[in-house]
Amino acid sequence: MGKTIAIAVLSAVVGAGLTLALTRSPSGSTSSRPARTADGKPNFSGIWQAINEAHWDLQAHEARSGIVTQPGVYPSYEFARVPAAPVLALGAAAGVPGSIGVVEGDGQIPYKPEAAAMKKENGEHWIDRDPELKCYLPGIPRAMYMPYPFQIVQSANKIQMAYTFANAARTIHLDKVEGPPDDTYMGHSVGRWEGDTLIVDVTSFNGKNWLDRAGNFHSAALKLVERYTPITPDAIRYEVTIEDPEVFTRPWTISMPLYRRLEPNAQLIEYPCIEFAEEFLYGHVRKQPLVRRWEGETMIVDITRKVPPGDKFYDWYRR
């Protein structure tokens, strides 16, 4: 209790990365793309992206730090808390940009008292609790407003959505389909058209997702009603009503525009984040864990990538 953590880094090696193009969109020219499909429905096929701060916090908020703290040199005083070592190391990258919010009505999320306490605790510990950091599938609606593009491929009876983060995907069934045998991260989506609005009921969640990085969450009882309404050929109004009687006192709604990516070479680039989270998830099972030991108030961390003696590939690579 009351330790001020310093991290002693012994050495580090940074490896090279490789990204692969998954899909390429048609030309960004609006004139070359029909506004409607052959069956007369709005044409949502293409690459889209939300441009807002909902990924960090659905509610209105000022810009702030990563707000993960630990006791300082005066552990009995809350005002003397200091940034936790992992957040401090990230600098401004751990900050949260300000936002006017996307929650409709009074802007409040109607938590039950015990759920509100859990949300607060989540927010204070997002650096090791947020499912995004573990590269878990982001779930719906979070996948819709992460700061990465996603692709819609539309047909008469199915709508496919592919997301950049974690190679997530889902199918919106416009035809009759049986429910899934198990609950999942991305849920089960069944859609219908009401005029030009696509309405999607999403159920069968496993309750392991968050709604944003601020710690807003839901349970496996979550039910969503999404509405996709065209504003222009290149913008969609996205609304989702969120209902979860185990967490919230009433249904509530968020809304935002989604924008079509118009670059001629717009495409999804693979983001295989699981390989970036392996140490975070499984580092404790290393034969020699990176968190080596405590020396008083100093945590000794070794992030050296050990090379076995006589490794021929490494010797060849270093030539």
Regions found by a protein language model. Name each.
Residues 2-319:
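PEST-like low-complexity, intrinsically disordered acidic/proline/serine-rich tracts
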